[in-house]
Amino acid sequence: MDIVEIIKAIILGMVEGLTEFAPVSSTGHMIIVDDMWLKSQEFLGKYAANTFKVVIQLGSILAVVVVFKDRFIDLLGLRGRHRDGKPRLKLMQVIVGLIPAGVLGVLFEDYIDEHLFSTATVLIGLVLGALLMIAADVFAKKAPKAQTVDQITYKQALIVGLVQCLSLWPGFSRSGSTISGGVLVGMSHRAAADFTFIMAVPIMMGASVLSLLKNWQYFTIDALPFFTAGFISAFLFALISIRFFLKLINQIRLVPFAVYRIVLALVIYIVYF
């Protein structure tokens, strides 16, 4: 494996890291960067290339764990009980938010992989996701009941979990759907974003590990440098992206991302159709 292919791995990791947790659809960006330009399937093969995308997604997940490490320590009860009387996000609220998409994902995984992963379906997801995000900003409550993630209710967690099911459609965007759902049920943009990232870790980790176990044979000595470079790149760029996004989301809200998604959909449409 030569240096050019390692550079391609770094670029793909960068795209994954920058877009996985922003509400812009990492799938749509992979179509443009990989399918249209870098073409990893040509030198890795179809299944190894798909395994590589799972590996770099794990890099992005690790970045979330690093950014929210204190939160996960609290959720797992590793600090002991807090005695200040303040409300705090509970592990059970996260589980409630995970159940709907988790169940549907397991039931329809094969159908989604076989029938919904196409350029046309991603285009539809990009546009419909953008419309949902615009609606969320238009109808957002002026004084959200949950200003922080510690103030969300079980009902809000469940509704966000139900809306997250939309992200099973490729191109819709997990963060786009869940942040929109959170805003529509009375969370601030930052609270919804925090809850989105926290929920993403177990559901994405589970899906990624299962996929890797199914495709372990593609971890060859030849592919290892490519996989490693992509993983590290995705991790580093996801760290940057997550921290930047969380600082700005309450100010810029969702409409700018929605406009960007529509432009991206137009670019893909012009190139492919």
Swiss-Prot record:
Keywords: Antibiotic resistance, Cell membrane, Cell shape, Cell wall biogenesis/degradation, Hydrolase, Membrane, Peptidoglycan synthesis, Transmembrane, Transmembrane helix. Its main location: membrane. It catalyses: di-trans,octa-cis-undecaprenyl diphosphate + H2O = di-trans,octa-cis-undecaprenyl phosphate + phosphate + H(+). It is an enzyme of class 3 (hydrolase). It is a multi-pass membrane protein. The keyword Transmembrane helix applies. The chain crosses the membrane at residues 3-23, 48-68, 92-112, 116-136, 152-172, 193-213, 220-240, 252-272. One of its GO terms (biological process) is regulation of cell shape. GO terms for molecular function: undecaprenyl-diphosphatase activity. Its EC number is 3.6.1.27. It is found in: Cell membrane. InterPro entries: UppP. Coiled coil: none annotated. Pfam families: BacA. One of its GO terms (cellular component) is plasma membrane. NCBIfam families: PRK00281.1-2, PRK00281.1-4, undec_PP_bacA. HAMAP family: Undec_diphosphatase. Belongs to the UppP family. Catalyzes the dephosphorylation of undecaprenyl diphosphate (UPP). Confers resistance to bacitracin. Bacitracin is thought to be involved in the inhibition of peptidoglycan synthesis by sequestering undecaprenyl diphosphate, thereby reducing the pool of lipid carrier available. This is Undecaprenyl-diphosphatase. It comes from Geobacillus sp. (strain WCH70).
